[in-house]
Amino acid sequence: MPLNFLLPGISMKRVSQLTALALLMGLAAASTSAADTMPTLTLSTLQQHNGVAIDTRLSAFYNGWPQGANGPQGHEPQALNLAASWLGALNDEQLSAWAKLHNLQASTPIALYGNADDNAKVAARLKAAGFTHLSSLGDALSQADRLQKLPHFEQLVYPQWLHDLQQGKPVTAAPAGHWKVFEAAWGAPKFYLLSHIPGAGYIDTNGVESEPLWNKVSDAQLKAMLAKHGIRHDTTVILYGRDVYAAARVAQIMLYAGVKDVRLLDGGWKTWSDAGLPVERGTPPKQKPEPEFGAPIPGQPQLMLNTEQARALLHRQDASLVSIRSWPEFIGTTSGYSYIKPMGEIAGARWGHAGSDSTHMEDFHNPDGTMRSADDIAAMWKSWNILPNQQVSFYCGTGWRASETFMYARAMGWNNVSVYDGGWYEWSSNPKNPVSRGERGPESSR
C-alpha cells in the first residue's frame, strides 16, 4: 500500500513528538503536491529536530502587515520567506542558490505555513528540487507573542493597503492626517503619462538633487519643491517608482527636510501592476501649493552627511561608512557611471552589497522586487562588521542606491543611519582623498 494512503487516517494532534518526527522523515517523501498530503508538525517539534519553517505568504505579511482585520502580524521565529508568488520568477538554479544560502539540505526537516494552495505550490517545487522531508506547520501564527516582525513594517506599504486607503476603507497603520501619493522618477513623466496609480502626483528627481555632483538641492530649493507639491511636515507622503531607488531618493531627502511620515510602496510600480489593481493615464494632477511647511528645514539634518562627516566614520568599530555599490565598482574595475571617470572605492569603507551593476539592487530584493528579509540583510552586513548599534552611513555613486538601503535599514529599526550624499562621485573628484582598489575582504576596513 502506498504510504500516502495512510495519511487521511492519521491525526497528528494525537501522536507523540517521536511519531511526528517519524512521519516527517518517512512519510514526507511521499507526494507533496498538495498541502493536505503532508504531515503536520508543531513549531516546538520542528525546533527540537533542527527543522526550518518557511512562510509561503507575500513578504508584506511576513514583515508584519496583518492579512485580515485583526489578523496575526509577523512570522514565526527564524522562519524563512519563500512566497508562492515568487516561484515563476525563480529558476531551478536560483532556488538552489536560495536554499544553499539558508543552509537547507535535502535532509533538513521543513515545515510550510500560509494558505493551503500556496503551501502546495511551494512544497511541489521543493520536492522537485530534492527536499523530501516536508510538512505543514500546524500551529502557525497561533501565538501572537512569539511572532517576529519588521520593527517599522508600516514604512513599506503594499499595493492592496494603498488601494484600500484610496477607497476609504479602514487600514492598519493609517496616516494620522492628510496624505498624498506620488510617483518619482528622473525627468519628464514619460511612463507616468501612459499608466500610473490613480490619483498619484509626479515628482521629478531633479527637484531634489542637481548637478554638478547630483547632491541634494539647497534647503531653500527643497522648501520650494515641497510647497509646490502641497507637502507640509505633517503630510503623510507615499512614494513609488518604476525604479524603487528613485522613490527612495526623494523619500530620504523628504525625511531630511522634516516630513515626519514618509513611506515607500515596497517593490514599486511593478508590485502594483502585478497585483492587477486599477491604473489611469494622463498628466499629473495640479497640486494645491502649501505655502508653509510648518517646521524648520532641515528637520533631521543628521540624516545627510557631507564628505568630512563621512570621513570621520572610517576605521572605527562603532561606526561604518558603507558602500552600496556592485562588487566590480567596489574593487575598482568600473566606476559604474559614464559620467564618473575615476574607478575605485573610499579607502576604509565597508561593502554593504548592492547588485550586479550600478542600476540593479538584487542583493536587497526578493524575486518580485520587494525588500528581502531583514534577517538576510542583517546577516549580509554582519559579515562586513556593519552592525545595528553603530553609526552607519550609506553611499553609492550619487545617492539613489544608498537611499533605498537607508529606507530598508530604517524599517529594520536601525536608528543611527544616514546617507553620505556626495558618495563616490564627490569623494573621487578630489585626488587627495584616499582610494582602495583590488580584491579585499572585511579586514580591509578595520
Language model segments and positions:
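Gram-negative bacterial Sec-dependent N-terminal signal peptides
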Residues: F5-L6, I10-T32
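Cytosolic catalytic domains that perform sulfur/thiol-centered chemistry
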Residues: S33-R446
